Amino acid sequence: MIIAIFLSLIQIILGTQVRQFVDEQAQLFYYDKSKWFNKIPVIYEYHRTFSIAVVSINFFLVYLNNKLSLGNKYVNHLMILLLIEVISGVMMFYFDFPFGTQTIHLVFASLIFGVQFYILLNNFLIKKTSNDIQV
């Protein structure tokens, strides 16, 4: 889970750089959203490609959760959040930023990070509790 949180944090940082680029393009081209990505910056390519790593590591966590019968329902909820996050990102790029997609993308990125952190803390608590019981 620590690796997933670390990757998500990097992805959020890359996303803020993409957002900065979009804001600069919005100032240049105003509301002509079709021109915002005429020249795709390298940081966007990193952000888009790195999302594959983020989804993959979280999918692996779901796989482990199910295979080991850990019963952590929050890991499955995390995949739903990731799916919505990816869909909103794809919609922003291919459909010229439909209304609300930026907000959804930002809010769900925060939710994903929060749920991952909650799962991590919960795992530490379970481990501590099981160690206390064994002593």
Put a short name on every predicted segment:
Residues M1-V135:
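Polytopic transmembrane helical bundles with strong interfacial aromatic enrichment
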